[in-house]
Amino acid sequence: MKEIILIKDFDPIDLTSLEIISRLNQFYKVNIFINSSLPNKVEIISIIKLGLEDYNLINQVNILNISREELLKLDSNYIKIDLDNNISSDQFIKTKYNQDKFYLDENFLSVDLTYIDNKLIQKGICFYTSISILKYITEYKRYFALDVIKYLSKSRYEHVLRVANISYKIALSNNIDPYKAYQAGYFHDLTRNNSLFLQYKDKVDKKYSKYFPKNIIQDFMYHQFTCEYALKDIFNITDEDIYKACRYHTSGYDNMSKLDKVVFVSDKIEPGRDYPSSYLFVTCLNNIEDGFKAVLKANKDYLESREDYSSINQNLLTIACYKHYLN
């Protein structure tokens, strides 16, 4: 039986590569080539194994940790596929979540799929790797997470991890792209309680102050608006879906996408909050539209119970959100 050797920069391994491995594994013995000269090969292999576990492939796929010279010497029993060169590449995943991204011909060698550049994952520009790998990267602070922790306190960072995880679960349950949900949940508080927002204060005032009493944006609202500027400048993220989910996660507004709603509710009901929210989480899992309205109503009731309600919630964005979704 011939064996496949897949060659790519698997640092970290991406969703498309995992899908290819899963398909090929039905008909071939699959090997993943890792260059033994890489200084961080041990961690790369550990991360690959996390992805293989998510795809139930951990005991079926072999990781070939050898040099390139040794790879070239392998005999004709091995079919070598260079995924970086044999896949049509457009630098980014553009198909919608859960659509078929590729097919294999009758020999299961020819592929037509959307290429994912692993460096985009390293930089935090896209999150299209397995959920266990995302958790490893963010919890153990690898790749892009090394930059994120520069701006967030320990408690704030723990909060964004919880929001990211809840966002992923709710999105997955509602057939919404869970990787974008994790990404938006993870980045949503990037400019909260740090000096980053000061760099963008003038831009935000000019664009959004008209929605607030006396044209003054409350301090706790700034970070939702400044986030997208930091995402673009620091991480080169240009995805408007991510921008928008972060832009209104505190105030809400009257034309929210499903992704916007996922991040909004996840921020409000993550388990670190000091009020019971498990029933709201279940409602969101079952139906994000019903869950969003339930969370919005619960949040409105909570804010109205506060003595400072008139000063914290009387902005046109939140008022429009209540009017559109609760009336």
Task: For each feature predicted by the language model, list its residue ranges.
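Nucleotidyltransferase catalytic core that binds NTPs
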Residues: 1-147, 232
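Histidine-centered active-site/metal-ligand motif
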Residues: 10, 14-17, 159, 188, ...
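Divalent metal-dependent catalytic cores for phosphoryl transfer on phosphate-bearing substrates
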Residues: 52, 61, 149-151, 168-295
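Charged phosphate-binding loop/patch that engages nucleotide di/tri-phosphates or the phosphate backbone
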Residues: 126-147, 302-327
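All-alpha helical catalytic cores of prenyl diphosphate-utilizing isoprenoid enzymes
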Residues: 152-156
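Long, amphipathic alpha-helical surface segments
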Residues: 288-309
